[in-house]
Amino acid sequence: GAIKDALKGAAKTVAVELLKKAQCKLEKTC
């Protein structure tokens, strides 16, 4: 349903942001 799709989209966005933060910390590019 629409709600499930919205939650999936939000979860993906959050995961991407967390990955970006983790990556910049590892590479010290923050």
Curated annotation (Swiss-Prot):
Has antibacterial activity against the Gram-positive bacterium S.aureus ATCC 25923 (MIC=18 uM) and the Gram-negative bacterium E.coli ATCC 25726 (MIC=18 uM). Disulfide bonds join 24-30. The keyword Cytoplasm does not apply. One of its GO terms (biological process) is defense response to bacterium. InterPro entries: Antimicrobial_frog_2. GO terms for cellular component: extracellular region. Keywords: Amphibian defense peptide, Antibiotic, Antimicrobial, Disulfide bond, Secreted. Expressed by the skin glands. This is Brevinin-2PTa. Coiled coil: none annotated. It is found in: Secreted. Belongs to the frog skin active peptide (FSAP) family. Brevinin subfamily. It comes from Pulchrana picturata (Malaysian fire frog).
